[in-house]
Every structure is written in C-alpha cells, then in structure tokens.
Amino acid sequence: MKALGNISHVSNKGRIIARSDRTQQLGAPVFTSDGKRIGKVHDIFGPTRNPYISIKPSRAINPEKFENRVGETLYVGIKNVKKWGRRKRRRK
C-alpha cells in the first residue's frame, strides 16, 4: 500500500476529503493505517501538484466518525486495471 495523504475534512455530502501530493487512480480502494478499508477514490480536484481527493466511504463506514480524525494518514491499494478494447467473440 502507498500513502495517499492526510484527512482534511468531511464534506456536507459525507465524502472524506484528503490532501495528497500526487494523483491517484479513480476507484482505487482506500485504507486506514491499521489496514481497514474505508472506501474508494471518488474524485480528484484542485491544483495539480497538491490535489484534493474525495473518498466515497463504504456503506458500513460512518463518515462523521472521521471528523475527529483530521490529519490521519490514509493509504491507497492497487486497483485491478480493466482491459479496454473490443472483446473477441467466442466460437460455438
């Protein structure tokens, strides 16, 4: 796992906003320091050098609990990359 960034705040829509030093792949899973999965990367916005990353929490996670964890480091896992392009037909 690679370090994603630090929690900045929780948005009005329940997204966890983190400040990062690099962009991440959309849909990549996000973990806490103890390895618990909290959600996935939903959106990236802001300046290119230090973007903000919006994290959509999993249904089991209450985003209000992260309001008191501001400054905690989050980590990103490796997402399986889907292959783009045309699929070949199977012969019967």
From Swiss-Prot:
Gene Ontology BP, a term: ribosome biogenesis
Disulfide bonds: none
Signal peptide: none
InterPro entries: Gar1/Naf1_Cbf5-bd_sf (IPR038664), H/ACA_rnp_Gar1/Naf1 (IPR007504), Transl_B-barrel_sf (IPR009000)
Ranges that cross the membrane: none
Family: To M.jannaschii MJ0782.1.
Identification of the protein by name: Uncharacterized protein MTH_886
